[in-house]
């Protein structure tokens, strides 16, 4: 599931934001403020505060701003690159990552993409 979900996020980033980098990092975001927001979120996650980072992301993405969609997709891409031991120690799971991506896609009215991630969960 790890590889396929990362590939799916990479495909969505290419379709929506014309990002074709081999590895998706904060550097693919052109806007420096948005890049810093993503870095802050991934730093929280890297320190085991995934729930806190995800809550901040949720608040940001309620406004429908496409830049925040890009941040969200990259956040979950980063998170999905973590090993299972790290996720477990942070009280998080791959299923929660997939549900987060699905929820993000639904908030941006990307129902086809949300359905693809829903299928990936099952």
Locate each region found by the language model:
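Inward-facing hydrophobic residues that define packing positions of alpha-helical scaffold repeats
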Residues: 5, 12, 50, 56-57, ...
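Amphipathic alpha-helical repeat scaffolds
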Residues: 9-13, 38-42, 58
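Alpha-helical junction/boundary sensor with strong preference for TPR arrays
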Residues: 12-19, 51, 63-65, 83, ...
């Amino acid at each position: 599931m790890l590889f396929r979900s990362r590939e799916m996020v990479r495909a969505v980033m290419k379709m929506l934001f014309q990002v074709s980098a081999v590895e998706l990092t904060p550097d693919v975001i052109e806007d420096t403020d948005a890049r810093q927001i993503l870095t802050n979120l991934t730093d929280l996650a890297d320190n085991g505060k995934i729930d806190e980072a995800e809550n901040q992301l949720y608040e940001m993405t309620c406004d429908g701003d496409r830049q925040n969609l890009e941040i969200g997709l990259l956040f979950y891409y980063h998170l999905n690159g973590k090993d299972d031991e790290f996720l477990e120690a942070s009280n998080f799971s791959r299923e929660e990552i997939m549900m987060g991506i699905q929820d993000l896609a639904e908030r941006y009215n990307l129902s086809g993409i949300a359905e693809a991630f829903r299928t990936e969960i099952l």
